[in-house]
Regions:
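Compositionally biased, intrinsically disordered low-complexity segments
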Residues: 1, 16-19, 32, 69, ...
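N-terminal export and membrane-targeting signals
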Residues: 1-13
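Positively charged, low-complexity intrinsically disordered regions
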Residues: 3-5, 33, 40, 128
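Leucine-biased recognition of intrinsically disordered, low-complexity hydrophobic segments
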Residues: 5-7, 18-19, 50
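Bacterial N-terminal signal peptides
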Residues: 10-23
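Ser/Thr-rich, Pro/Gly/Ala-heavy low-complexity intrinsically disordered linkers and tails
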Residues: 22-69
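Glycan-processing catalytic domains of CAZymes
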Residues: 67-444, 452-474, 479-530
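Extra-cytoplasmic beta-strand recognition segments
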Residues: 448
Length: 530
């Protein structure tokens, strides 16, 4: 279960440097003394390349040759694919949402990002000064901005709504209670106003929060819903407000039946789409099926468990109900020492493809912005890499067709150290450990969207790994991490570098605190966001 920490991160750099014809020499033409070269050949087919291991039979040889010169980019655009218009995606029967966690907006107090709460929650100096033994509670933060004038909270929500729309999302799932001493929990009116200002078609799905857990009252939830019942931005199906509570099984299903009955008595019709902490639709159906419009689940976070997304959709449909498939990039929790191995971008891609294969009705990205656990919003540590990958899949999910690629894009995903790297046990007393699921992976991944065949190159110091891709498409190329290096990446065609990408994340041989978060970056050669 998520820990509701009231914390927050430092100056925004998006973790990527895209190199085209200008300013590339330092990275793309340096010689490699006694460089070891591994080679791999493959095609970008209909699968996403979830097994991203390098070919164990590849040959290795010494190389001191310089990288080819870089060809200037001419086919510019934000995405590798021709993204459908917002109106086209919005008209699709299938919907995509992201779970919004109110305590962690873009800014907590509208201060300079170098000295705000987010900075205090993530910098090494503040962490050590606080005397913590585990490490910082936050490893990442939203993309930053200078202090704003006027209604800065609503303006920040407007920014996030635009980001979500760019990713193909239809709305946010807002964890909601209206009475709190913490103002961050009571900003639903500002979010609703932001949706109206940016795009009246963007919707907010209510996730009533059990503030007191099993001791929560029906009256408090009913009153919360009645306060916003007439808001046009609320997500409804057939004119009925959708209620999607997280961890609803803390109370009996009769609790939720009573809420809906009371709301109906006030003229407010509603449907229930519970987001269970555990239990598939088949497990929950006996007690819940007569009360729900659909099912959802908080879900798992590893490649090997991704098929539960497909099975959940199949089970929900067999019970005559909708399914909102849980999708996540990763989950790492400094506060209690747990993480789950997501295999770079592998878990995200696997879950998305299983949701498509299972014909899920809706998607729920878990979460938009809970930076203590799992987040997908554009951020300092990942730039737009996760967001752009999601945009590709939401287009596929909604249109039923894998997007064709009209230009190239390169993205990297890797940690800042191996999972077994030495750390300072005097400052971190609880070792990070995998709670369950797939075992630890220590790879650098290049996720490439290719408009035509080409050669992919990953350079880590003197280690150069290559992969020949024989068809256009999305392909994952992953190789073992090399501590003490900062990876760089290339796409080559006809002996020339079409695109080069430099990671902003050095791979450390040893660390003060363990950091199991996957960093990321990248985009198209021009027109993309870092």
């Amino acid at each position: 279960m998520r820990k509701r920490l009231m914390l927050s991160a430092a100056a925004a750099v998006t973790g990527v440097l895209l190199l085209t014809a200008a300013g590339v020499a330092a990275c793309s033409v340096a010689t490699r003394d006694a460089a070891s070269t591994t080679q791999e050949t493959g095609a970008a087919g209909t699968e996403a390349g979830l097994d991203a291991s390098a070919d164990p039979s590849a040959s290795a040889s010494a190389s001191t040759s310089a990288s080819p010169s870089v060809v200037p980019a001419t086919n510019c655009g934000r995405y590798a694919f021709a993204k459908a218009s917002t109106s086209t995606l919005r008209a699709a029967k299938k919907k995509a949402f992201a779970f919004y966690f109110p305590p962690y907006p873009i800014s907590i107090e509208n201060k300079d990002p170098g000295s705000d709460y987010w900075a205090k929650w993530t910098t090494e100096a503040d962490r050590l000064a606080s005397g913590t033994k585990q490490g910082e509670e936050m490893l990442d933060r939203p993309l930053t901005r200078a202090p704003l004038s006027g209604n800065w909270r609503q303006k920040d929500f407007e920014t996030e709504i635009r980001q979500a729309i760019d990713m193909g999302l239809d709305g946010f799932i807002w964890e909601y209670h209206s009475v709190s001493s913490d103002a961050r929990w009571t900003q639903l009116p500002a979010m609703l106003a932001a949706a109206k200002a940016v795009d009246p078609g963007f919707r907010i799905m209510l996730s009533p929060d059990l503030q007191q857990g099993a001791n929560s009252t029906q009256a408090s939830i009913v009153n919360d819903v009645l306060k916003v019942k007439s808001e046009p931005a609320l997500y409804k199906v057939d004119g009925k407000i959708v209620l999607a509570p997280f961890y609803p099984e803390r109370v009996a299903v009769s609790f939720w039946d009573g809420i809906r009955t009371t709301l109906a008595g006030s003229g407010v019709q509603s449907v229930l789409v519970p987001i269970f902490l555990s239990g598939s639709p088949n497990v929950r159906a006996a007690a819940w099926n007569n009360s729900v419009y659909g099912y959802s689940l908080w879900g798992n976070r590893w490649v090997g468990g991704a098929d539960s997304v497909r099975k959940g959709a199949v089970e929900a449909h067999a019970n005559g109900r909708k399914y909102m498939a849980p999708i996540a990039f990763e989950d790492t929790r400094i506060y209690d020492g747990r993480y789950w191995e997501s295999s770079n971008s592998g878990a995200l891609r696997a879950m998305m493809e299983k949701a498509i294969a299972g014909d899920a009705d809706w998607l729920a990205l878990i979460t938009w912005n809970d930076y203590t656990e799992s987040w997908v919003a554009p951020s300092k540590g990942r730039g737009y890499a996760v967001a752009d990958t999601i945009a590709y899949y939401t287009s596929w999910f909604k249109t039923g067709k894998r997007p064709s690629l009209v230009r190239d894009a390169l993205y990297y995903f890797h940690r800042s150290h191996r999972t077994d790297a030495p750390y300072d046990t005097s400052l971190q007393q609880i070792a990070m450990h995998i709670a369950n699921g797939d075992g630890a992976s220590n790879k650098v991944e290049l996720l490439a969207f290719l408009s035509a065949p080409g050669k992919l190159v990953i350079k880590q110091g003197g280690t150069v790994s290559t992969k020949d891709v024989t068809a256009a498409g999305m392909v994952s190329f992953a190789v073992a991490m090399v501590p003490g290096t900062t990876p760089s990446f290339e796409l080559q065609r006809a002996g020339k570098v079409v695109q080069a990408l430099q990671s902003k994340v050095p791979i450390k041989a040893k660390v003060t605190h363990q950091d199991m978060m996957y960093r990321a970056g990248g985009g198209t050669a021009c027109g993309g966001k870092a």
